[in-house]
Amino acid sequence: QYDEPSSALIKMYLAGEFGKDPEKVSPYAASTFYAVDRYASYERVWKDYYQKGGVMLCDRYTTSNAVHQGGKLQGQAQAEFFTWLYDLEYDKMGLPKPDLVLCLDMPTELAHLLREKRDTQGVGDRDIHEHAERYLARCRETARLAAKYYGWTLISCVKDGQLRSIEDIHEEIYRHIAACLED
């Protein structure tokens, strides 16, 4: 959706126009940027398809807001944020709740090495999140906490200290999706 008008505030946020440190940008404000963009996408692009029984597979959704913005908070403030976020997006905005959430879990250090490799290959630009290693480590912990709290399925991208192959991770993802569709 980055080419749509509804993503303007997201682009500004990720470019650092509200501050270069993601932790200093209100998680409530940043979450609202993403929520409004999701709402616009739902209403304009996929609502009819979904309501007719279509299956949607989303790479990042409300759950990504829970991880990236919830990672800015701790303890009771984080729990209150999760409640607020889900109320905003699912109850007030009417976005569909996911039937299945798969969270790819990778140690922050390995993710950093993969980003550096991507940088040397000239693939993509880093956003303000990708420049903040401590923030990303906290996001990983938030994802693991949220997975337990909400019943998400964690998929480890590492086995015996080594990165799993894309094909191996794909097969595990496929199994979970197939099982969900059978229900």
Predicted features and spans:
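Short loop/turn elements that form and flank the Walker-type P-loop nucleotide-binding site
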Residues: 51-52, 96-97, 148
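NTP-dependent small-molecule kinase module
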Residues: 109-183
